[in-house]
Amino acid sequence: MVAAALAFMASAQPFQSVYYPSKLTASTITRVHQRASALRSADENIHAIVRLCDEADLDRLAADYGVAFNVVTGNLATAVIPMRSLVAFAEDADVENVDAGNTVRAMTDLAREYSQVDALHGGLPDFPRSFTGKGVLIGVIDTGFDFMHPAFRDAEGNSRIIHVWDQSGRNGNTPSMGYGVVFDTPELIRSAAHDVSRDTHGTHVAAIAASSADVYKGMAPESDIVIVATDKSESGIIDALAYLLDYAEKEKKPMAINLSMGTVIGFKDGTDPIASMIDELLDKSGKKCLMAIAAGNEGHRNSTIVTEATGQGEVINTSFTPPSHMRENIFIGCSTTSAFQVTLSLVGSDGVAFETSISSDVSESVSHENITGEKDYSLVTLSPMKDADGLQRGVSINLYAPLKDGQKWKLSVTGAAGKYIACCDYGELDNGSNASTMAATACGQIPISVGAYVSRDKFTNLQGTERSSDWTVGERYPLSGMGPAFDGRDKPDVLAPGAHIISAINNYAASYNVNREDLAYTEVDALIPGRTNYWGAMCGTSMATPVVTGIMALWLQANPRLDFDHVRKLIGSPGSHIDAKTGMESLLAGVELPKSKNTVPYIYNPFTRSIVIIGEGVVCVEVFAVDGTVLKRKNRPVEPVHIPEGAMRIVRITTSTGSHILKI
């Protein structure tokens, strides 16, 4: 079957077109071309999300093609595939498609004040005790970590980063996922000092959620931190989430997970494979861990078209010019499985220089090289796309092509009745809007999607220069990704402070990843001779998301059984500003309290089997076996009281005015 109809100017030399089975998506084909042009070794691997047929034999596939499968949810699996066997693997009858996906990209001072976190840290008079994240894990999936920054040390100078998986690392212990390295002791973490990346994004994000430094303290300064330094692939994100969920289960501790990275384009209704797999993993875990995902920073771009068609005909007609790097990714999706036709044309003053078409229901993908007839290294790749349910109702386009003066791309979509979406990754569509610009990664049903509002419109940098913007404090950060989702849900779920946020900077970052003009504070390290630490300002939903993650850690400290449905009630209607104090008041009001006004409120933590007292006046906490044997007695406990293992335990909480009995 011919997947594309091609036309080009009579004066041009024929360009090269290569047809592939539709099992290889546009992004996968593009990745293959990029590695081939860079003369990369065929022994290298490609990370992808694979759709498997029903009852596929994973053991056979692994043995035949050298593929390592990691996370499997339904018919979707993350996999590490040798480049040399990629095509043969994709053509196997047990494989429906292989999608390398697009590269994920990055999406506290006043932040604490605006989100009312300081009231939780302070305890009295606002609350009967302080909430700082103690006993709670914060998992961060990101890149560019400085493990040695004082933002991540406790009062004794010990690192609060207790476990690291660097997916791109090469020297060290390999985790169960089969790639990268693990640092799981204080000595290994200290020796590594940082992940492979030369970025600073992860350091900034993690410190917003959990910094314990006196200057620019984070939301949950006494939480323990677990890091996955991602390789920036969609499959790597899924593997990271599964890894963190497994770690929390082994440690028997509640965890709040932060993802300030993602992919922009896709179905944007929760049926993109990455969004669906995130939902599936959280659901399988019993929703014991909470997760916040950045809504993205595309709210300033007219990059999306959403339209309804009532009958057969042209439903989208638009044009676009890629940014200066001449790259663009386009996604077109439909609410139904009715086939639609996509035509992409390169036009200029002298007519059509190149044209290609693809139908959403075909069984082939196609790539075109050197589309001008000259060796310009251009590459245009098109493929049909399936959603997480296996319904083929999308088309993906990846392109790179240098344009001549006056040239632009035209995109036409013809189809039957239904709702359609077209969105681009980097630039704008000429008749697009900024509605539904939030990241496809953040459109799942379960995680909390986070947008950003402005909490600071200016700051003074290290040079003494005031850096300011024309943003309005309290209003939506202009770049914050907007809803609704393609299926009509209001998104994002909540807004949090995201501009300008001052937080820790990675000492090991490459100079091109740190804008010196944005550095706002520095101090000499108290423990490491010769080291100077830095803090700087950054903006975006990447910064807003760890505010929410850290606040959820505080709420988990108060109630370790907190779930996503309850969190949504605490944060209010979609688009509300996060308010940690009001949320905690609502949370504590719903905690099971002893009926007598003479007793104090408590919380039982099932993860650690401990009683947490959240009121004053406790004289003693006693734990008994059912035969009356005293197993434990704590006078005036400050720390949580652990309940020994057993079929049933009786706990008596005695105060100066009475006592309360409970069974565990």
Feature map (PLM): residue ranges:
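Short coil/turn motif common to extracellular beta-sandwich-like domains
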Residues: D43-H47, M326-N329, Y604-V612
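Short, aromatic- and glycine-rich surface loops/edge beta-strands on solvent-exposed regions
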Residues: F89, I330-I332, Q407-G415, M648-S656
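Subtilisin-like serine protease catalytic core
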Residues: L124-I237, K252, A256, G286-L290, ...
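C-terminal subdomain of the subtilisin-like protease fold in secreted/lumenal serine endopeptidases
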Residues: Q34-L39, K250-T263, F267-G270, K288-A295, ...
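C-terminal outer-membrane/trafficking sorting elements
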Residues: P594-I664
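Autoinhibitory N-terminal propeptides
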Residues: A5-R129, L137, P150
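Extracellular S/T/G-rich loop segment that most often corresponds to the catalytic His/Ser-adjacent loop
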Residues: R170-T185, N302-Q392, S396, P402-L403, ...
